[in-house]
C-alpha cells in the first residue's frame, strides 16, 4: 500500500498561524510504509516548542488512528502505552520543556517535609518517653495506696473535665496504650488529681491518728506482777490511792494500770460470787423438792 502523507504538494500550515483547520495525517497498517508520514510528523513536532508532553506514534495494533494537529495543541493519546513504545514517533523534547515548575517543586518539597515530620517515629529511648513511663508506674502505685480504683479516678475526672474520661482512659494510660500526645495531656491532669488526692488522704490520716491516740494501748502485766497484785487483793480488795501508788512503784507499773486492775478484779470476784450463789440456790431447791 502506498503512503499519502499530506495533500497540497507536501506543504502544511505553521502552528502559529490563524488557521484552525486540522491537518489530517493518515497512518497505514505497516510502520515501514508510514516512514514519510513520520518525517512530516517530526517536522511538525520540531516547530511545536510550546508543548509539554510528547505524542507517540499513532498506531495501536492493526487499528488506524487519526490525530488532528490544532493551532498550538495536539490531541493526547487515548491509551497509555509502555515507555519503550513512546520513543518511536518523535524525537525527545529539550530539557527546558521537561523542567518542573518551580512553584510545584517548592510545594512538593514542603509537602515532603511536613509528611516527614508527621510520619517521623518517636524515639522510645528519649527522656520524655522514660519520664512518661515512670510517671505511669508511680501513678498506679500511689493510686492503689490511696485506695482509689481506676473507676474512681475516671469518674472524678469526668465530673470536672467531661465525659471523655473514664475507667478505660485511666487503664490505657497506666498500660501506656495512649498516643504520646494524649498521654502528655493526661499526665498533667492526673498529676493535679494525684496531688489533691494525697492532700485529702493526709487530712484523713491525721484525723484517724488523733482518734487512735485517744485510745491507750493495752498494757501487758507480767506473771510476777499479777501474783503480787493477787496477794494485795486478798489482803485488801479496795486499796486507797496512796496504796495503789506504792504498789505501782514497787511493780514498776503506772498508777492507772494498778487502779484499773483492782477494779476489774473486783468485778470478776463479784461475778464469781453471784454465779456461786445461784448454783447453791439451785442445788438447795432441788434437794428440797426431792424430799
From Swiss-Prot:
GO terms for molecular function: chromatin binding; DNA binding; DNA-binding transcription activator activity, RNA polymerase II-specific; DNA-binding transcription factor activity; DNA-binding transcription factor activity, RNA polymerase II-specific; lncRNA binding; RNA polymerase II cis-regulatory region sequence-specific DNA binding; RNA polymerase II-specific DNA-binding transcription factor binding. PROSITE patterns: HOMEOBOX_1 (PS00027), HOMEOBOX_2 (PS50071), POU_1 (PS00035), POU_2 (PS00465), POU_3 (PS51179). It is found in: Nucleus. GO terms for biological process: adenohypophysis development; B cell differentiation; cell fate specification; cell population proliferation; determination of adult lifespan; inositol trisphosphate biosynthetic process; negative regulation of transcription by RNA polymerase II; pituitary gland development. It comes from the Eukaryota. The 9aaTAD motif is a transactivation domain present in a large number of yeast and animal transcription factors. Interacts with PITX1. Interacts with LHX3. Interacts with ELK1. Belongs to the POU transcription factor family. Class-1 subfamily. This is Pituitary-specific positive transcription factor 1. It comes from Rattus norvegicus. The gene is Pou1f1.
Amino acid at each position: 500500500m502506498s503512503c499519502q502523507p499530506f495533500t497540497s504538494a507536501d506543504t502544511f500550515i505553521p502552528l502559529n498561524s490563524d488557521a484552525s483547520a486540522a491537518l489530517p495525517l493518515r497512518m497505514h497498517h505497516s510502520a515501514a510504509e508510514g516512514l514519510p508520514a513520520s518525517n512530516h510528523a517530526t517536522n511538525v513536532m520540531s516547530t511545536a516548542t510550546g508543548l509539554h508532553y510528547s505524542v507517540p506514534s499513532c498506531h495501536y495494533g492493526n487499528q488506524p488512528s487519526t490525530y488532528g494537529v490544532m493551532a498550538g495543541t495536539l490531541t493526547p493519546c487515548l491509551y497509555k502505552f509502555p515507555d519503550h513504545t513512546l520513543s518511536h514517533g518523535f524525537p525527545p523534547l529539550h530539557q527546558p520543556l521537561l523542567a518542573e515548575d518551580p512553584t510545584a517543586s517548592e510545594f512538593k518539597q514542603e509537602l515532603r517535609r511536613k509528611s516527614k515530620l508527621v510520619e517521623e517515629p518517636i524515639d522510645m529511648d528519649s527522656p520524655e518517653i522514660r519520664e512518661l513511663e515512670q510517671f505511669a508506674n508511680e501513678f498506679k502505685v500511689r493510686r492503689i495506696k490511696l485506695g482509689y480504683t481506676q473507676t474512681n479516678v475516671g469518674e472524678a475526672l469526668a465530673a470536672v473535665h467531661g465525659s471523655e474520661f473514664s475507667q478505660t482512659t485511666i487503664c490505657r494510660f497506666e498500660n501506656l496504650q495512649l498516643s504520646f500526645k494524649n498521654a502528655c495531656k493526661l499526665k498533667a491532669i492526673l498529676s493535679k488529681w494525684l496531688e489533691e488526692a494525697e492532700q485529702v488522704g493526709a487530712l484523713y490520716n491525721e484525723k484517724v491518728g488523733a482518734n487512735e491516740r485517744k485510745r491507750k494501748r493495752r498494757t501487758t502485766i507480767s506473771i510476777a506482777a499479777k501474783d503480787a497484785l493477787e496477794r494485795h487483793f486478798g489482803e485488801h480488795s479496795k486499796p486507797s490511792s496512796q496504796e495503789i501508788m506504792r504498789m505501782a512503784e514497787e511493780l514498776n507499773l503506772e498508777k492507772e494500770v494498778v487502779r484499773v486492775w483492782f477494779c476489774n478484779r473486783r468485778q470478776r470476784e463479784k461475778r464469781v460470787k453471784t454465779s456461786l450463789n445461784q448454783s447453791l440456790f439451785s442445788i438447795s431447791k432441788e434437794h428440797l423438792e426431792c424430799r
